[in-house]
Amino acid sequence: MPNNQSFAVVGAGIIGAAVARELTLRFPGSAVTVFEKEAEPAAHQTGHNSGVVHAGLYYEPGGLKARLCRRGVTLLQEFCTNHELPYEECGKIVVALDEVEERRLQDIYARATANGVPGVRLLDQAGIREIEPNAVGRAALHSPHTAIVDYAKVTRALVDEVTAAGGAVRMGTEVLRVTNTASGATVHTRAGGQAFDLVVVCSGLQSDRLAKASDAADEPSIVPFFGQYFVLEAAYRQHVKGLIYPVPDPKYPFLGVHLTKRIDGEMMVGPNAFLSFSREIYRGLGINPKDSLEVAANPGFWKFAARNLPTAVREIQSVVSKGRFLREAQKYVPSLADADATRATRGIRAQAMTRDGALVDDFVIQHQGRVTHIRNAPSPGATSSLAIAEHIVEAAIQEHSLTSAPPAG
């Protein structure tokens, strides 16, 4: 039926594309416009991640990550099935190497159980070998339904749905700011302003900058961290059947160097995690003066750095030495001792940080009038993307009493 409402989404990563699609589903016949500064969708975080569909093991029960990850898995699997996109439940083990890590593993198991993750179980050494014959460890947690996809392909399929529903996708169009008006919001580009009833900003690595330019909250700020990946040489691909992860260090918000099967059959080692001197440079030295100076001027970063110096020293060793990097993986799969690997394109993660140097763990979604800003959506952001879209659109419907079609499913 005809619908005279208009909506805009800023950013064509997987979350932006999912929000745009959700708007076309809930408001059929409305005008939905996606603004993306790059020439193609999925140009940044979406197109540079590991492709893992997380089951929801690690997240604080009751938080947005926990709730939206589980719903997101269901929606993503359905979407891939309906669009004939590859989706493989290869499973994952999280391996403890010592007694301290084994105690942490018990905590992860408790969280996974509380979050309703299906099929998770604890393994002894014999159990590890049943799942991954070449892996070693003191104990492990097995998540059989952890999966892999190609998130860039998923994003393109979402964008195709938006255009098929009559939406407009304006690639190569950078949004400078978004302002609230008496009856809606205006998206400002170099070509001028365009009015909409509702705007959702999903700008990832640029989320803090666009929020501040739009007079939204100053916090959280974004500090970019890069993750380096290596592609294991083909002769060793079969040494690992699925995904092998270390037990994460609770003092550091990243999951550590792990072995990840890709949907194309390649086996990845990585990523590590270290401060990035740019937000969007993926090769070479990766230094952007503006981005680097912004981090240096961020008082929260220095507080974070002071608290995490030992971990940073360990991580920089894996950054500068491929051998050191691969040795981390060999702790879990000793048969990789003679394996070589080639450097792949790095990924850059938008990590939200508070003024006191705390890394923001959960998703952060801020509402300002008729504008919604996604301020933090790290892993499992891609896994949760379709559920995040549902959550945001439903919140807008309730907040602004918008007339919509009922939610799917």
Residue ranges and their predicted role:
Residues 24-47:
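Glycine-rich FAD pyrophosphate-binding loop
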Residues 141-198, 384-397:
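Helical element adjacent to the flavin cofactor pocket in flavoenzyme catalytic cores
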Residues 60-71, 95-104, 141-160, 170, ...:
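Short beta-strand to alpha-helix junction loop
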Residues 114, 120, 217-219, 236-237, ...:
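Flavin-binding catalytic cores
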Residues 304-407:
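C-terminal catalytic lobe of FAD-dependent flavoproteins
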Residues 18, 178-288:
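Flavin-dependent oxidoreductases
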Residues 51-127, 137, 256-257, 266-268, ...:
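Dinucleotide-binding Rossmann-like beta1-alpha1 core, especially the glycine-rich loop
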Residues 2-15, 33:
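Beta1/beta-strand and adjacent pyrophosphate-binding region of the FAD-binding site
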